[in-house]
Amino acid sequence: MLNDMDFIKTCDVPGPTKEAIRAIILYKSAVTPNDEVVDVGCGTGGITCEFAQRAKKVTSIDTNPDAISVTKQNLEKFNLGDNVELINDSGSNALKNIDNMDIAVVGGSGRELEDILEIIDSKLNPKGRIIVTAILVDTKIEAINKLKKLNYNPKIMEVNISNGRVLDRGVMMISENPIAIISANKR
């Protein structure tokens, strides 16, 4: 796992997804060296960088050109990227041109979540996996409901990570924002 502190970050681009959350996403995805992964809403590229080390191909999509730039910088910093394609476009537009995917991770949908999930469903390989991360309650509900309509059996977990800061007289736990991880396998 890459260390959160090693990522290049900017104020204008969210991320990276915290290390513990990336670890859960990797576990839930059951990624193999033969998998083709799509990362929708790549932000600073935390998910992209982790999958680039483990999958055959990663396609990373973001509407924000700064996000694509920071993701590229992080890939270069970690000597990754030979198997990564970066696309600066909306998720729904970019996904229409991708024909093969085993794993789709949606970390940012730009209010297009239902459309994005429909397109992913139509292109996801048999036994493919979908993972949606969400901090907004509305996004969690929207993802669950849409996946159910698409005949998936989604599972949801909400993760609250706290990290300790060592002080002179003890350890203080500092909480991160809770995040939901919604996962579903194609039947």
UniProtKB/Swiss-Prot annotation:
GO molecular function: cobalt-precorrin-6B C5-methyltransferase activity; protein methyltransferase activity
InterPro entries according to UniProt: CbiT, Cbl_synth_MTase_CbiT, Cobalamin_biosynth_MTase, Methyltranfer_dom, SAM-dependent_MTases_sf
UniProt keyword annotations, A-Z: Cobalamin biosynthesis, Methyltransferase, S-adenosyl-L-methionine, Transferase
One Pfam family this sequence matches: Methyltransf_31
Catalytic activity as recorded in UniProt: Co-precorrin-6B + S-adenosyl-L-methionine = Co-precorrin-7 + S-adenosyl-L-homocysteine + CO2
Transmembrane segments: none
EC number, as in UniProt: 2.1.1.196
Residues the entry annotates as binding S-adenosyl-L-methionine: 17, 41-45, 62, 91
Pathway stated in the Swiss-Prot or TrEMBL entry: Cofactor biosynthesis; adenosylcobalamin biosynthesis; cob(II)yrinate a,c-diamide from sirohydrochlorin (anaerobic route): step 8/10
Top-level division of the source organism's lineage: Archaea
GO biological process, one term: anaerobic cobalamin biosynthetic process
Keyword S-adenosyl-L-methionine: yes
Enzyme class: transferase
Family: Belongs to the methyltransferase superfamily. Archaeal-type CbiT family.
Record protein name field: Probable cobalt-precorrin-6B C(15)-methyltransferase (decarboxylating)
